Design a protein with these regions (language model features):
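A donor-sugar binding/catalytic signature common to diverse glycosyltransferases
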Residues: 222-269
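Short internal beta-strands
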Residues: 170-176
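Short beta->alpha connector loops at strand-helix junctions that form conserved
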Residues: 17-18, 240, 257-261, 279-283
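C-terminal amphipathic helix plus adjacent low-complexity
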Residues: 285-383
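Nucleotide-sugar-dependent glycosyltransferase catalytic domains
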Residues: 1-170, 182-204, 210-213, 303, ...
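Short, well-ordered beta-strand core segments
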Residues: 14, 88-89, 236-237, 255, ...
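Active-site donor-binding acidic/aromatic loop of nucleotide-activated sugar
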Residues: 214-223
Length: 383
């Protein structure tokens, strides 16, 4: 939400962008409010209103303080910002989330924005290549949950190892979640008790020991580029972050998502709805091993994933986004100028008729003349 205020101060065009759908629709709920089962179009619609309402009330005071003290702008309200009229660029694939029919013309689903062939200097070590190329008929899966911080990393390792052994697969395990917790404990310094430091070290050693116990079945890495690895293996298991989900689907790999929070549940359910994989809410040996058996043996799922991957690889997300920017540039300029004019017009009234900070709480629902739908803005709580 900071960009819109900076654009107003600089008097430049402004576009919004996000890797998950945030624009109001009746087609599906807000990604942060995904229910356990469908609740209907009205529920879907209201999740966006309530989310925007909650966010604005949480940030309004600091936002207006930033506007006044840093940008030299007067306070504003969600109604005056009219964020629903600003051009939006969504960096996900329309093959995964098609644009809803109730989205307006300036809301674009461009396709994923991939950075191909980045000059990182990374190269796989010989041990990793040997593991992938080993003459072993068992399919290889990738398992990694990003930088998620968990309370018991050893338990996650235990579940992964037991599930892999039960599923007749081999696994490349990326330990980002546990190493981050271990590093944090190591950095606590001399002020922490030696006993705690020794415990953290022991925990880290336990994780390494159990992963190294089955060298022909499990290979542990700290990190590996997804665009290099995923096309070489059978399936991927991850937390459902937008970027990792995109990488797995682009490679045409069946996907298991274990969501932890936020939009990860949305992507997990979308993958399962499309027949591209499984979403498991609880990380248990029973759940993970069952899902691993499906993604490693279901040839129809692999076929569907390959078809979707082919479509995604044909997309030109970055190029499409650039074209959308040029197409809607004048509209973006007009939106910024309209915001400036509204601020200038109401500045005197606001400063003389409202108490300081009252704008922060303004929340309304008005009939949006441009869309013919109810928009966040002019419903005010009863005094």
């Amino acid at each position: 939400m900071v960009g819109i205020h900076m654009a107003e101060a600089l008097q430049v065009p402004y576009f919004r962008s996000f890797p998950m759908p945030m624009t109001r629709t009746r087609s599906f709920p807000h990604p942060f409010a995904t229910p356990n089962h469908p609740k209907g179009r009205l529920y879907n619609d209201m999740t966006y209103v309530l989310f925007d309402h909650a966010v604005w009330r949480a940030i309004a005071s600091r936002t207006n303080s930033f506007r006044r003290s840093t940008l030299g702008l007067p306070s504003t309200t969600y109604e005056k910002l009219e964020v629903w009229k600003i051009p939006y660029l969504y960096s996900f694939s329309p093959h995964i989330v098609p644009s809803p029919l109730d989205w307006l013309d300036w809301i674009h689903c461009t396709g994923y924005w991939f950075l191909d062939n980045p000059q990182t200097g990374w190269a796989p070590d010989a041990a990793l290549k040997a593991f992938i190329e080993a003459p072993d008929s068992r399919p290889i899966v990738y398992i990694g949950f990003g930088s998620i911080i968990v309370s018991d990393p050893f338990e996650i390792i235990r579940v992964i190892v037991e599930s892999v052994l039960l599923s007749n697969v081999r696994a490349i395990v990326s330990q980002g979640w546990s190493s981050r917790l271990h590093d944090k404990k190591q950095q606590e310094g001399a002020n922490e008790a030696t006993k705690k430091e020794a415990g953290a070290k022991k925990e880290g050693n336990q994780e390494e020991d159990i992963l190294k116990k089955y060298p022909d079945t499990i290979f542990s890495v700290q990190s590996v580029p997804h665009d290099w690895l995923f096309p070489k293996i059978r399936a991927v298991v991850h937390h459902g972050g937008a970027g990792t989900t995109a990488a797995g689907l682009r490679a045409g790999r069946p996907t298991i998502i274990k969501p932890f929070f936020a939009d990860q549940f949305f992507w997990g359910e979308r993958v399962e709805e499309m027949g591209l994989g499984r979403c498991i809410k609880q990380l248990t040996v029973e759940n993970l091993s069952a899902a691993l058996r499906v993604v490693s043996t279901d040839e129809n799922m692999l076929r569907v994933a390959n078809q979707v991957g082919h479509k995604i690889r044909q997309e030109t997300g970055v190029e499409t986004a650039i074209q959308c920017i040029y197409r809607d540039l004048e509209l973006a300029k007009a939106r910024t100028m309209s915001s400036i004019q509204k601020t200038a017009k109401t500045n005197y009234v606001t400063s003389t008729s409202k108490k300081d900070g009252e704008d922060d709480q303004d929340w309304t629902l008005i009939e949006d003349a441009m869309s013919g739908s109810i928009s966040p803005g002019s419903w005010k709580p009863a005094d």
